[in-house]
Amino acid sequence: MLPKNYDPNEIEPKWQKFWLDEKIYKYELDEKKPSYAIDTPPPFTSGTLHLGHVLSHTWIDIIARYKRMTGYNVLFPQGFDNHGLPTELKVEKEFGISKDQPEKFLQKCIEWTWQAIEAMRNQFIRIGYSADWDLEYHTMDDWYKAAVQKSLIEFYKKGMLYQAEHPVYWCPRCRTSLAKAEVGYVEEDGFLYYIKLPLADGSGHVPIATTRPELMPACVAVFVHPEDERYKHVVGKKVKLPIFEREVPVLADEDVDPSFGTGAVYNCTYGDEQDVVWQKRYNLPVIIAINEDGTMNENAGPYAGLKTEEARKKIAEDLEKMGLLYKKEKIRHRVLRHTERSSCMAPIELLPKKQWFIKVKDFTDEIVKVAEQINWYPPDMFLRLKDWAESMDWDWVISRQRVFGTPIPFWVCDNGEIILPNEEDLPVDPRFEKPPRKCSDGSEPKPVTDVLDCWVDSSITPLIITKWHEAIKGDEEGKKWFEHNFPTALRPQGTDIIRTWAFYTIFRTWVLTGEKPWHDILINGMVAGPDGRKMSKSYGNVVAPDEVIPKYGADALRLWTALAPPGEDHPFKWETVDYNYRFLQKVWNIYRFAERHLENFDPASAPEELEPLDRWILSRLHRLIKFATEEMEKYRFNLLTRELITFVWHEVADDYIEMIKYRLYGDDEESKLKAKAALYELLYNVMLLLAPFVPHITEELYQNLFRERIGAKSVHLLEWPKYSEARIDEEAEKLGELAREIVGAMRRYKNSHGLSLNAKLKHVAIYTTDSYEVLKTIEKDIAGTMNIEKLEIIKGEPELEERIIEIKPNFKTVGPRYGKLVPKITAYLKENAEEVAKALKESGKIEFEVDGQKVELTKDDIVLRKAVFSEGEEVETAVVGDAVILFF
């Protein structure tokens, strides 16, 4: 029996343990069953899940549960992305271990990461996540690193991997290069400096505007727009840089924005991506003025050794003294920062460095073509990837100057020769292992000490989960697994990593297999705080899952995620979770009520012919099943979730169950059996529809109400409800809707008179013309539901008479004005009630004389109460469509 109260903290852990112990979600390769492989996002092992993880991974879980119910063999692994700067920073800060002790440092990174994995896995389980944990993977596992290194060797063999000096995004705080996807612009307050640069021929100045005066020592040109009339006369001339006494050319290029600042900018190597484009486009020299640690170098002359911020201030002061800085304007502008990890957020420099690159810029058209073969949900998310591909200025820098990461598996000779490892030795770590052979000239190759960008690790996840790495070795089981599951069915992920995880996965998978990685990609938005702003500690609006679940349970939180629209940001609202919790309480109470009535019910005894309201609710149910299936196939959970809640709370609980209670408690055994049959079919299917969304409460309901009859070990091993056209009954639906409206009007009458819903009504008559036959069909349902002693359904229109039953002055307004005349005014109103009412209706006032004195009263001065009478009895009325309800 279901306990009296719904307690998610009691039932949820119980069923989570049951699912794990019974291996309910274990995947077994079965070539006879259709496969549905999910390329799940491996979260970075920070040690805790945030609400963004809860949203995205609950979506994934909803899909996995639904697909199992529709007959698919669901491959649902979960991985963890282990490598990354935050772990290194934590080990340095919390454990005091330096990267100068690489082996000890690595060991501590691994130890800490295992602790983080354990904590995050437990959080996944606590939200009801139905992954097969036997398939869990970690990017720091040796077999995983071996697969990554094998993929890298394949790229090298295809001529797509190279080492070169090139401007890269450099984090002075982390002392490492970054991929474009790891950096981003942040809106900040700053200054725009207006500087006059003297023309070398002495004929005047070119005014430029810049936010970074400290880059002047690295200036190699000044650019203006070719159509800008202000500067046409200086194009081709040179300006002389103040302080540094160098001459640089003035060039024209259409990329210049004439409306920004003065319309003239200087090109420094390198202030931003545009500087890189111009330097390469015009083959300009490269001058570097900033060190790796963010200080100025010897090219900065007298400013060498200063931090960039200090040099900016000092150069601006010196230019002002020279009369060349003529304006300093406060602005709101975008600053490039290390945005991928909030623990850093340092300003980014563009520095030329020798790094390892994967060729990608030349393949963007192919990447877009492959992406077009994938079904994007929502479709406009494809455009984000396309725009990103078209905006790429250079290749993918994959090397990182870190310790904890997948090693780049190469040794390099002085002559440029690259020594590859023996593939049977993978994974290798050149930092600690000797090369497999010497250079061709007999010299010792030098190890590559860099590690890989973590996106190199995670961009082969669809290959990892389908055992590509085993299949290419000729492993028979691996080949079967790969052939059956690749391309995977689905990639679910967030909008924020379209340009990284989605882009690089499509690219790498296409290069390695010639195929798309997935058939579908589902994009979720970001989670905003309760105030609608991005969740941030600085805003004080961060809500952790561990704050929500103890109070409301995982199922209520899961419903909040299901209400998120695809591709759009979704604010966390406490009131939404509270509403969801109350909905689940309502569900609990529905099934507790039904449990008593269905205890000895045998579904095999269900009669074929049901009563009208039974046919109505089952018709509505099957319309919902059809809609639910369509929405689930399109991954549109938000609309479906709203429909489910509305249907269960209102049509099932408020209407249908209330309208069959009299039958369940009554003496008509045949009618009672029909009600039980409909209730059983209804609640069984509602449970199945809810199961992917709220797996814990539905498991509890199944085990208590249905398992003995059905036999399956878990609700999540049952089939998704099948839509039946035979159950659609349009006439019954019209009838049911009319019953809802009639009963609703009667409930409102009871409520307005302070009557309980089960209070008896002595006499009610319903007059109707068009709905007479329908109402006669449900006459006993209306009478039984509303406890009406005498209910009449009468064809035709009622004869109603409106009478004034009370008319008197409003003593508060009339008394002060007319004093002793009030009694006579009262008498006049009663004697002339109809005339007074007519005058008030037409003009809003009435004038008459009392004892020779003129009296003028408005609507506010008169209390007028009318009543409706039918056959001499006072009645109250309500109108529903063409039906008029009379309450005697």
From Swiss-Prot:
GO CC, alphabetical: cytosol
EC number of this enzyme: 6.1.1.9
PROSITE patterns per record: AA_TRNA_LIGASE_I
Ranges that cross the membrane: none
Gene Ontology MF terms: aminoacyl-tRNA deacylase activity; ATP binding; valine-tRNA ligase activity
Compartment(s) where it occurs, according to its Swiss-Prot or TrEMBL record: Cytoplasm
UniProt cross-references to InterPro entries, sorted A to Z: aa-tRNA-synth_I_CS, aa-tRNA-synth_Ia, Anticodon_Ia_Val, M/V/L/I-tRNA-synth_anticd-bd, Rossmann-like_a/b/a_fold, tRNAsynth_Ia_anticodon-bd, Val/Leu/Ile-tRNA-synth_edit, Valine-tRNA_ligase_type_2
Keyword field contains Aminoacyl-tRNA synthetase: yes
Pfam families listed in its UniProt record: Anticodon_1, DUF5915, tRNA-synt_1
Reaction(s) catalysed by this chain's protein: tRNA(Val) + L-valine + ATP = L-valyl-tRNA(Val) + AMP + diphosphate
GO biological process: valyl-tRNA aminoacylation
Binding residue positions for ATP: 537
Matching HAMAP family: Val_tRNA_synth_type2
UniProt record similarity statement: Belongs to the class-I aminoacyl-tRNA synthetase family. ValS type 2 subfamily.
Domain remarks in the Swiss-Prot or TrEMBL record: ValRS has two distinct active sites: one for aminoacylation and one for editing. The misactivated threonine is translocated from the active site to the editing site.
Protein's name according to its UniProt entry: Valine--tRNA ligase
